[in-house]
């Protein structure tokens, strides 16, 4: 945008968040689909509703949803906290999150409820009612043993069909997800292990997320990879003895 302004594309006008920045955001989203002829373009707005950093992006999404009508659908991921001391699930944070999103001019079409505990139908209906969302468009994403089980869980709740309905598209036969389910079965039924030592600089596990997931996936063909999380700091002269247990291929 700075280059465009200096080039004179804005004819000397003062650059503003609306419409200049929001138009640029929309242009990039549309360009991705037009350039590669995608059927669907998924755009994620990270952060928390109400953050000042995300305001221009939310406004751009609001405009796109208004301009595209049935060709756009908004899915809001929100959190249902579990109070262990009281043994209670709280829906208020979700209600306030959706209310804040609505104040930005965006009515979510679908809600995905992130939760540690399974949500019963009563909670699902309560959220649907207070958030003005169809009950069949409220799905839960509870903690699972593996993140790779999430797509199967989402399909079982009809998330894919809900998206198609909101886009006014025909709902065909339910995919079997055969290759995906086979992948999960191989992981669960692995009989051998390969131990791999990973030496890194940071303690934060997400810093090496791509490496960990690559090993996870590779370990299903046909064995399971057992990754050892090691710190970099102790790795100094004479400090390699602790890594003697790390091995590959059983050696």
Give the residues covered by each predicted segment.
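Cofactor-cradling patches in redox/metallo enzymes
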Residues: 251
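Flexible phosphate-sensing "switch/lid" loops adjacent to ATP/NTP-binding sites
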Residues: 1-225, 229, 234-248
């Amino acid at each position: 945008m700075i280059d465009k302004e200096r080039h004179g594309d804005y004819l000397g006008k003062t650059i503003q968040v609306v419409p200049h920045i929001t138009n640029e955001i929309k242009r990039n989203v549309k360009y991705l689909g037009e350039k590669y002829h995608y059927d669907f373009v998924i755009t994620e707005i990270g952060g928390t509703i109400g953050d000042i950093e995300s305001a221009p992006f939310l406004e751009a999404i609001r405009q796109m949803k208004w301009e595209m009508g049935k060709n756009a659908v908004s899915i809001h991921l929100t959190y249902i906290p579990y109070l262990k001391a009281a043994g209670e699930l709280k829906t208020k944070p979700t209600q306030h999150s959706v209310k804040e999103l609505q104040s930005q001019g965006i009515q979510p079409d679908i809600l995905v409820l992130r939760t540690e505990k399974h949500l019963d139908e009563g909670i699902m209906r309560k959220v649907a009612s207070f958030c003005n969302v169809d009950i069949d468009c409220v799905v839960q994403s509870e903690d699972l043993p593996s993140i790779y089980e999430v797509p199967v869980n989402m399909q079982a709740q009809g998330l894919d069909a809900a998206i198609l309905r909101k886009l006014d598209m025909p709902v065909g036969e339910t995919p079997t997800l055969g290759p995906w389910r086979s992948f999960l079965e191989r992981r669960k039924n692995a009989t051998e292990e390969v131990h791999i030592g990973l030496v890194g600089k940071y303690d934060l596990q997400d810093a090496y997320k791509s490496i960990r997931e690559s090993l996870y996936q590779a370990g299903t063909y046909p064995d399971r990879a057992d990754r050892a999380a090691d710190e970099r700091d102790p790795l100094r002269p004479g400090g390699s003895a602790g890594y003697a247990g790390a091995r590959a291929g059983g050696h």
